[in-house]
Amino acid sequence: LKEQFPDINAFNQEFGLDYWSNRVNKWEDFPDIRGTINQSLAAEFQKFQRKLVTDFLSWQASIVKEYKRPDQFITQNFDYAWTDHSIGYQPEVDQYDAACCMTVAGCDIYHPSRDKLTGAEITVCGNISRSLKKDNYLVLETEAQGNIDWLPYPGQLRLQAYSHIANGSNSVMYWHWHSIHNAIESYWKGVLSHDFSENETYQEACVIGNEWKRIGSHLKNIKKTNHVAVLLDNASLTGLSHFPLATTARHSYNLVMRSLCDALYRLNIEFDMVSSRERNFSSYECLIVPALYSAPEDLLYALESYVKDGGHLITTYRSAFSDEHLKI
């Protein structure tokens, strides 16, 4: 904040700290923001935390780059916002920034199965991963037998595997090989159960592997040229977690985003994800902007220019409410 605001009075003004006598007169008096009533401060601290993740991963990657062979790559398992399965954009990491130091993006995608399998989680989460490097990605973890009530019907494991590949993944790796015998994931079942015996999940994984031995060269590096994109924004995700919709609480942003993405999926309209740090959207015929609660002026101007140049913009309620510091 000191780097952003050399004048502490400007900082107080931007963050509305005269309210309820929260004014900070010296940086040395800066308060602990835990439990703050000022959501602008809380959001700024969460932004700082996301930067710490980016800096840490970049530091790790720089060490690995010193020693890795030219044919080796660097990846990272980026996960997603979570209810009882993967639902959308991760609030605690700016994945677009953090992925810059990676060679290839990696992810884990977990979702309901059996009668509750929709395919939408594979698509939405996969689209996020594909967008991080604007390239193919790796599914570093996904379910085998999975969580309680997730044991796939015969043929579903294969269906899910091909869905990942069709979305642009170059791998499907299962968590995990055999079911563990202790701790919190004791019943998060792997390919094998606790008895290490062959089962239907193992046999179906063998079918998938044998098929990919034959045709895998035709499945890797599948590319897409989509005409529709959905814009993702960490700041708005954070903002709506502090000022949530009445019916969706802390997952407000992701549930608004998913309502749009799931509709596209049901209509069989393929789409990319794009970061809110981008300013040129001209490669897309339609740009969908869910709940852009927090936005700097230059992003709003970029969206306006996109429309003036012939683009079709779809946005929702709770968009353009506040600036990048949650100031309305």
Across the structure, where does each feature detected by a protein language model lie?
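Carbohydrate-binding surfaces of carbohydrate-active enzymes
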Residues: W27-F30, S58, P70-D71, A99-I328
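Polysaccharide-binding and catalytic clefts of secreted carbohydrate-active enzymes
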Residues: L1-V104, D108-I122
